[in-house]
């Protein structure tokens, strides 16, 4: 026996001398030790692993577990980015009415996580925003109309960046839509819409 690797069961820590069961993590088990936590039947594919406890569940019992925890998951809500439900006692980052897993909210520029540190936000729609960490804020282009960052679609007019809603007529304050004609007041270097021209 010397020189051979002795395989031990991950659950009972005893040597495996007969049939070896290997799970997706390459852990080895006795056949009688690799069983469902709920019903104690030997596990075959497919099976599920609880990420928090490491316990294994057969497909039938996983369905039962999901049904039992559904009201709790729905009451906790879900992440505005990945749409996965929050777990009980999980840290959640809330910005306005949007809720995020801590690991989901990232800087649009450097992709580092944004936790509770200082950040900048550009609202794209009522449910979609771009975020920028403080380190990257100085690196991004700013809108010439509102002076906030431009992370999403921008309009280039008169050699400057604008949010689509910030490029406005200097006289009447109407938004000048992309590809619409406008003129530039040479004295003030400001745009005028076709009506005010």
Swiss-Prot record:
InterPro entries: Znf_LIM. The keyword Zinc applies. Keywords: LIM domain, Metal-binding, Phagocytosis, Repeat, Zinc. One of its GO terms (molecular function) is zinc ion binding. GO terms for cellular component: phagocytic cup. GO terms for biological process: cortical actin cytoskeleton organization; filopodium assembly; phagocytosis; positive regulation of phagocytosis; response to imidacloprid. The keyword Repeat applies. Residues 7-68, 77-139, 141-197 form the LIM zinc-binding domain. Interacts with ChLim and rab21. Involved in the regulation of phagocytosis. May repress ChLim and activate rab21. This is LIM domain-containing protein F. It comes from Dictyostelium discoideum. The gene is limF.
